[in-house]
């Protein structure tokens, strides 16, 4: 930048901008509440809870994607430890309503009250999102599948049939939540109505022509919430910047909620980025989106609120193994979340923060078993660099109280002396504290840029640093603070190192700053006169320069942690990125605001979950993944430290901290699956003409009409949901007596579905499936000798659907759209089927297994009979000749085109006092056919769908609680060979990680009630 423009900037900054900021009054913006309570309020700047502004940094987790309540604590403790002030969750109507007369919030993992209680205990607010439609890459968007037949109308409207369907669930969800609101001393602070339902307008929202059907629907939902005790603000989330729905700042057309927000996925919600071009435009990595003007236009008297901001991406069928973590990794977290602050966002929730698993039939057809989502907390519950990077910002937003009330003063490259770098200035109009969000002027560029920044402070206009420069190396952003308040009465005039957190101990302040490894930083503290280096193992060039009443400190941090002591009592901890990753600030209170007077600071471990103080003893809970040095900054009255209940030997440093060493966790090994006794049986007897389908497993498929908007091409109606069978594999037996030469079948099951057909036990053919095909037809000719003369012939169609489509596609039927016999060669008249029968999940909608629930099982013979369940007696099964061993692996073989079920009982005995995660690995040996489908069962839970000819997922995490870590485990695999070549599949397992932990995974896994066993009622479903 030329000298004259720089001087002009400094003059404007010191006169005009400062004046504008100081003259801006809080009273210019109205403070809102909903008329029911003033505990939660909001204005242009932020949410208020109990009269205090809060920066809401939240993240999403789905309890129904990890059906082990004992592990919910693990997830929520990790969210809290990272500095988040809140978390959000979708409920799932379908998970709680197996049929249209049952709403279950009490059985097993359907009891959600522990989530609310944990939020209170841990000190986090909750954003509850009950639907009734949630999307979430869940089958039918979370709808119960009995609502997808057409009998309840087109859904998501005010149709009386649909209203009668959702009301019992929604009322119960509201009633439960009403007991846990901030208005009653608990932690639910807002309640979302519907999900991404941007339907308020007909045509262009600018015309404000209301969609009265949508308005009526929203008003019904809002009334139900209020009638059932919800008094906290009701919210809604616009799916994009084009819909502008449900906010009173935009219109009073009807159906409005209290606070509206905007969802955004700037790098695409799926690894297939082409799916997002209609919303985001052409995908360009690291291209940020502008939100500031949207919030100013659409919701100016409400906070910048993002109920969903991209936390990762789901992996579609045929997506890369392991997803696409590189698309939304460490750099994404660093850049985009800071960018939102530049856009004056003060409430955002990451979707997802923990993704979990699409176990059973939970998923919509868009994705496979894994819902890892490349989230900060991985599917196997491990944490890594993305989690730690996100923690750096979350801890900052929790401690930066001025950030909850800022005006955007300006932005552009004129703030810096490098045209490649821009800054966005946010300033608190009351305190004058400011935040300069620096970023490459072109966010898609990741060059290494050095610059100095023009800032406006209480000491005047400055260009910082005074020595050296600030660096943006790669796709990075930095938030430079000025007049940052911390401690009892201290002011950080500026810092080119980012603030991590600050705490007050014994009435003295500790300020924690960090820089990327090897970079320099400069900060200035008002009121300090001198300082000294207490610890500096890898720092260099630490200098202290007094300028009037300000002490300027310049340093370079090569690695690790340094400690400085200023003469005014302020202790400054300097960290490089790696050290900052393992730096924690656990509160000593359950207050979500985590006041600085109630914090301790801890350096070193993999995870610090919590801290509590009793007398002179500080109790820390957490995880150590290896031998680790521990350093604790706490009150000087602390003389004893315990780690996970055990006292550890500590030493006090010269600067007052306590140091110790944590031992490595014990090694954990798994028994080889190849050493287990594997047995197998054929699981497709239904293909044989001798099979008896007269039992209760089977239902006559004889409907001649349907309310589904998709009329079938032939009758009877062969839509599985019409007959109460909703999940995965269903079987159809069609009978005929007259001669025929073949059959035409058109089957629909969603992307990646497949089907096979048999005549009188003879294999006719299969649709193997593709990642994008949701419907497939085939004309199958009958081979000579397969027809039976003068008696009944039976066609079996086995089809596997991958869930119901989302949004308006929820009603797309699953089953056979057309079934026509072909005329024999000596006739022009095609015969007709005389009967169709269908089988699916044992018991249909009656929910034989309410603990695992209706999503868990399909209609395979093995599942109906309960072969996958613990306690099933396979003693009379013959010795298996369909398995071989390859080292620790077991290889499961199927001869011909059929389904075979393999099972073994494998003991586990993990040590106590550790957390461990285990995954199964499924694969296809080299040279073997991939034309098969497989399902993995662990203690009765279906925890993996493996389609090697379509998808690339080969690693399947299975949580403690589904696995028994100190007992016997029933492992089952159903292998469906879709060609005469048969199939061969390899199976192994591994330990993902082990940590010495306060979370005793063996104890969590001991909850046997989550693993109910086999019962004789299964026998009737043969």
From Swiss-Prot:
Q: Which Gene3D superfamilies match?
A: Beta-galactosidase, domain 2, Beta-galactosidase, domain 3, Galactose-binding domain-like, Glycosidases
Instruction: Indicate which residues the UniProt annotation says bind substrate.
Output: 90, 135-137, 195, 265, 373
Q: Where is the active site?
A: 196 (proton donor), 308 (nucleophile)
**Which keywords accompany this UniProt record?**
Carbohydrate metabolism, Disulfide bond, Glycoprotein, Glycosidase, Hydrolase, Polysaccharide degradation, Secreted, Signal
Subcellular localization(s) per the UniProt record: Secreted
GO CC entries: extracellular region
Superkingdom as given in the UniProt entry: Eukaryota
Q: Which GO terms describe its biological process?
A: polysaccharide catabolic process
Q: What S-S linkages are listed for this chain?
A: 271-324
Sugar-bearing residue positions: 23, 100, 211, 411, 456, 541, 554, 626, 777, 790, 832, 880-881
Q: List the signal peptide residues.
A: 1-20
Instruction: State the function annotated in the UniProt record.
Output: Cleaves beta-linked terminal galactosyl residues from gangliosides, glycoproteins, and glycosaminoglycans.
Q: What family does this chain come from, according to its entry? A: Belongs to the glycosyl hydrolase 35 family.
Give the protein name, as stated in the record.
Answer: Probable beta-galactosidase B
Species classification: Eukaryota, Fungi, Dikarya, Ascomycota, Pezizomycotina
């Amino acid at each position: 930048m030329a000298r004259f423009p720089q001087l002009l900037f400094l003059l404007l900054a010191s006169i005009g901008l400062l004046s504008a900021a100081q003259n801006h009054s809080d009273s210019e913006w109205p403070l809102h509440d909903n008329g029911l309570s003033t505990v939660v309020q909001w204005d242009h700047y932020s949410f208020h809870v109990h009269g205090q502004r809060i920066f809401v940094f939240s993240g999403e987790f789905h309890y129904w994607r990890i059906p082990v309540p004992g592990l919910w604590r693990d997830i929520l403790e990790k969210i809290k430890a990272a500095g988040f002030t809140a978390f959000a969750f979708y409920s799932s109507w379908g998970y709680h309503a197996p049929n249209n007369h049952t709403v279950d919030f009490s059985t097993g993992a359907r009891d959600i009250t522990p989530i609310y209680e944990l939020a209170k205990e841990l000190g986090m607010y909750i954003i509850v999102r009950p639907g009734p439609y949630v999307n979430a890459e869940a089958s039918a968007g979370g709808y119960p599948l009995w609502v997808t037949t057409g009998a309840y109308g087109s859904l998501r409207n005010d149709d009386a049939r649909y209203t009668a369907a959702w009301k019992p669930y929604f009322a119960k969800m509201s009633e439960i939540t009403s007991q846990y609101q901030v208005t009653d001393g608990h932690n639910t602070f807002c309640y979302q109505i519907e999900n991404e339902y941007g339907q308020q307008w007909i045509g262009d929202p600018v015309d404000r022509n209301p969609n009265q059907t949508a308005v009526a629907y929203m008003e019904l939902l809002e009334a139900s919430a209020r009638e059932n005790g919800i008094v906290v603000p009701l919210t809604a989330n616009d799916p994009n910047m084009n819909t502008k729905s449900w906010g009173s700042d935009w219109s009073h057309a009807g159906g409005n909620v209290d606070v509206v927000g905007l969802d955004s996925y700037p790098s695409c919600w799926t690894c297939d980025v082409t799916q997002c071009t209609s919303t985001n435009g052409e995908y360009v990595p690291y291209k940020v989106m502008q939100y500031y003007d949207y919030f100013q236009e659409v919701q100016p008297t409400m906070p910048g609120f993002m109920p969903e901001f991209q936390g990762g991406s789901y992996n579609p069928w045929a997506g890369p193994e392991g997803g696409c973590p590189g698309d939304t990794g460490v750099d994404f977290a660093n850049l985009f979340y800071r960018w939102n602050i530049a856009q004056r966002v003060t409430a955002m929730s990451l979707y997802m923060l923990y993704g979990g698993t699409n176990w059973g039939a939970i998923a919509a057809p868009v994705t496979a078993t894994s819902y890892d989502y490349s989230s900060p907390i991985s599917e196997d519950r491990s944490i890594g660099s993305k989690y730690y990077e996100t923690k750096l910002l979350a801890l900052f937003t929790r401690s930066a109280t001025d950030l909850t009330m800022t005006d955007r003063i300006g932005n552009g490259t004129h703030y810096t002396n490098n045209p490649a770098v821009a800054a966005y200035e946010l300033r608190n109009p009351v305190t004058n504290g400011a935040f300069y969000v620096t970023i490459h002027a072109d966010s898609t560029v990741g060059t290494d840029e050095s610059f100095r920044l023009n800032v406006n402070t209480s000491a005047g206009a400055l260009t910082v640093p005074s020595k050296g420069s600030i660096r943006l190396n790669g796709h990075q952003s930095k938030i430079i603070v000025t007049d940052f308040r911390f401690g009892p009465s201290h002011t950080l005039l500026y810092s080119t190192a980012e603030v991590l957190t600050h705490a007050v101990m014994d009435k003295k302040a500790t300020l924690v700053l960090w820089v990327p490894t090897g970079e320099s930083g400069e900060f200035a503290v008002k009121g300090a006169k001198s300082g000294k280096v207490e610890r500096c193992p890898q720092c260099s060039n630490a200098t202290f320069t007094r300028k009037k009443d300000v002490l300027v400190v310049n340093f370079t941090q090569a690695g690790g942690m340094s400690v400085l002591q200023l003469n005014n009592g302020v202790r400054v901890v300097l960290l490089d990125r790696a050290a900052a990753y393992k730096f924690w600030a656990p509160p000593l209170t359950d207050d979500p605001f985590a006041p600085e007077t109630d914090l301790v600071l801890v350096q070193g471990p993999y995870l610090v979950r919590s801290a509590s103080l009793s007398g002179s003893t500080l109790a820390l809970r957490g995880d150590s993944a290896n031998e680790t040095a521990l350093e604790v900054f706490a009150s000087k009255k602390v003389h004893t430290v315990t780690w996970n209940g055990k006292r550890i030997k500590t030493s006090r440093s010269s600067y007052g901290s306590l140091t110790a060493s944590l031992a490595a966790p014990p090694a954990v090994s798994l028994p080889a699956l190849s050493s287990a006794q594997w047995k197998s049986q054929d699981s497709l007897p239904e293909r044989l003409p001798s099979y008896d389908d007269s039992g209760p497993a089977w239902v006559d498929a004889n409907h001649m009409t349907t309310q589904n908007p998709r009329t079938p091409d032939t009758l009877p109606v062969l839509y599985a949901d019409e007959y109460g069978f909703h999940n995965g594999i269903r079987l159809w037996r069609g009978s005929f007596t007259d001669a025929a030469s073949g059959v035409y079948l058109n089957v629909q099951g969603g992307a990646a579905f497949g089907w096979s057909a048999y005549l009188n036990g003879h294999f006719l053919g299969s649709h193997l499936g593709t990642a994008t095909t949701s419907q497939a037809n085939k004309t199958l000719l009958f081979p000579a000798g397969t027809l039976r003369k003068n008696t009944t012939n039976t066609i079996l169609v086995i089809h596997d659907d991958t869930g119901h489509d989302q949004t308006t596609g929820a009603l797309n039927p699953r089953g056979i759209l057309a079934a026509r016999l072909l005329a024999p060669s000596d006739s022009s008249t095609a015969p007709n089927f005389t009967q169709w029968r269908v089988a699916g999940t044992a018991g249909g909608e009656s929910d034989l297994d309410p603990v695992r629930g209706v999503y868990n099982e399909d209609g395979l013979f093995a599942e109906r009979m309960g072969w996958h369940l613990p306690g099933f007696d396979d003693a009379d099964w013959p010795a298996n000749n369909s398995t071989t061993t390859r080292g620790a692996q077991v290889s499961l073989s199927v001869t011909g085109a059929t389904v075979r079920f393999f099972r073994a009982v494998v003991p586990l005995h993990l040590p106590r006092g550790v957390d461990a995660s285990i995954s199964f690995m499924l694969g296809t040996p080299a040279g073997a056919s991939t034309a098969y489908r497989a399902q993995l069962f662990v203690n009765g839970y279906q925890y993996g769908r493996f389609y090697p000819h379509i998808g690339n997922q080969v690693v399947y995490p299975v949580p403690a609680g589904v696995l028994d870590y100190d007992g016997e485990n029933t492992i089952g695999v159903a292998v469906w060979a879709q060609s005469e070549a048969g199939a061969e599949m390899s199976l192994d397992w591994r330990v993902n990680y082990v940590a010495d932990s306060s979370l005793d995974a063996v104890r969590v896994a001991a909850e046997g009630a989550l693993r109910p066993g086999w019962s004789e009622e299964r026998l009737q479903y043969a």
